[in-house]
Amino acid sequence: IMGMVKAKAGPVTLLIMVVCAVIYFLQMFGFGDGVFALLHFPAFEGQQWQLWRWVSHALLHFSVTHIVFNLLWWWQLGGDIERRLSSGKLLQIFLISAALSGAGQFYVEGANFGGLSGVVYALLGYLWILGYRCPHLGLTLPKPIIGFMLVWLVLGYVQPFMAIANTAHLVGLLSGMAIALFDSGKQKYQQTS
């Protein structure tokens, strides 16, 4: 299994997976409150200058299902980006989308959230737009995957009983799309010059 995981993932993909797993195990083995207090989105006066908080909330997960699904999508989508483009590009998308999706979620519902799903939706948005505008890069997503993820996004908004960071998902998707629009425009400009 590790060979398969490593074959698809670069160092950033693997590092984020390992960090998420370590943090999850710390949370499960009695350090949950301390870990959350250290890593949650900046909610209190002065925390906005603790810059790690703008992205570290994406490393928190609150159930086995939560972390497994997020890490599988991260590995699948992030691994493709890192292998085809670069580790720097994946890190850029992670940092920008974690900060923006976290800010959106905080603005709407406060700081009681965590998880990689806002970033996962950014990866989806990035691959969707980049695959459409620059198919020669080989980063196209199958339409059923895009459809499934968009339906899942909508379902998050229409069911009131589960704690889902819907705003983080939406802002993540939009931030990934925006980065892809910028990158694809730059790609097309470089091809014409």
Regions found by a protein language model. Name each.
Residues 1-193:
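A detector for small-residue-rich transmembrane helices and their helix-helix packing motifs
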